Amino acid sequence: DLYKLLEKYLAWKQFEKHQDRKDVLVIENLMETAITENAGKIIRRKTQSEESTDAVSNFKLYQLADQYYFQLSRKGDNTHLIKSQEALDIYYLSNQLKIWCELMNRSNILALQYDNMKFDRFIQFLENNLKDYSHYPTVSIYYPILQWLKDPNSDGWYEGFREKLFLHIKEFPENEAKDIVAYIQNYCVKRINQGRNEFLKEWFEIAQFMLPLNLLNDNKYISEWTYKNIITVGVRLHAFEWTENFIHGYYNKLAPEQRDNAYQYN
């Protein structure tokens, strides 16, 4: 019926956002139907390019690559099977880091409890093996954020972090990238509220970088409050020319019902 068609459409629309998962399913289907030559082309392209931040897709990709090369030569080696094992480790670490960040955030804001012993065990494991995993984008981004959330007065974690953020943020799915940016903006705002005005520049430069990536958008539009905050900080930093261009250039990025009021006010 019509509702089932709508469900399928919504599922497909969401699926379209995940190219790595699509590629893995195409490879799997090609191998099941014995069209291995085409499967091999995709496998070579995927395994020779930079790894995705989607650890589940990486895990399945390397499993399929191991299967493909083993069938091809009847000899093969363990390279891709070992890589699938590494991808599984990254999947575990990445998701644990994300969950612990959210648990710490809720603890800080809402005073909700978490299991301290589990947290200590996880941190001990991660720190003992950090040299093996710190180059992965999810670990290099979420671990410093977790350090801050665990100790909100600390600043050491932020040293060199912005460079990592700018380097890797495009590799994350849009909604996840927005969550990451929100953590960093909150950190900057807390420091600004403590009178640390050097963080105005940090907040502003992060906003400037994220704007063309649509990572400050609320669905399709920039909220009137984001628009106002960027303008306010730009003026405080005397970035008058950039701010004036932003006021006019992002007028159409505001929701239609808020557009004129926000524009005229600012």
Language-model features: where?
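Extended alpha-helical scaffold regions
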Residues: 1-266
